[in-house]
Amino acid sequence: LVGSEMCIRDSIDTDIGKSYATAYLAHLWNKQGCRTITQKFIQTGNPEGYSEDIELHRRLMGMEYLPEDEQGLTKPEIFSYPASPHLASRIDNRAIDFDKIKHATEVLSERYDAVLVEGAGGLMVPLTEDNLTIDYVQESGYPLVFVTSGRLGSINHTLLSFEAIERRGIKLHTVMYNLFPEGEDKIIQADTETYICRYIEKHFPDTAFVKVPCL
């Protein structure tokens, strides 16, 4: 990566290992000399000031909490109820402050070579009653790092997501194929990887493909 690069990280679904994959990619880029930080732009299911995903990122990246974590820049919006952002914000009776999120992301981009912004759930998760995560990705103009896996059904979910990404003109920066957690059917997992790789080569020839191992 050259200069200040911001990427939004999202996936086919929740519980697909986004946080694990985000930390892996950040660790990889840091090892390659690209100073990278992660951000969870909307965290739900946590008390004020705490983000379990950012804590996981730092642990897997081999880092202590960073000053930007303490300043709230890596976790600008936190809601207590474990639900999609539109519902969590309604339950907490507080609207999502998108200006606060944007400012935090911009500050991080000034301090680091790359910022990986982790989404909440999948691309079609509602952030508000009128806006989905994919709307935020499109409006921000940031390239997308997309996480999929080899579990049964992921080909369908992945290709539907690819069609939505292509239709909206979003730049697909990287596709991460997550082998974590272990326990998936190895035959299905191998075939899914081959199928998705061929699809990317045909439809997104400039997109990188990264395999995320079980660490």
Feature map (PLM): residue ranges:
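Short, small-residue-biased leader/transition segments that mark boundaries at the very start
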Residues: 1-8
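Hydrophobic "anchor" residues on beta-strands that sit immediately upstream
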Residues: 36, 114, 174
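N-terminal phosphate/diphosphate-binding loop that engages ATP/GTP or pyrophosphate donors
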Residues: 20-93
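Glycine-rich phosphate-binding P-loop
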Residues: 9-22
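Phosphate-binding/switch loop-helix module in NTP-utilizing enzymes
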Residues: 82-127
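Conserved catalytic-core segment of NTP-binding enzymes
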Residues: 107, 119-203
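Beta-strand-loop-alpha "switch" segments that mediate conformational coupling across diverse proteins
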Residues: 197-215
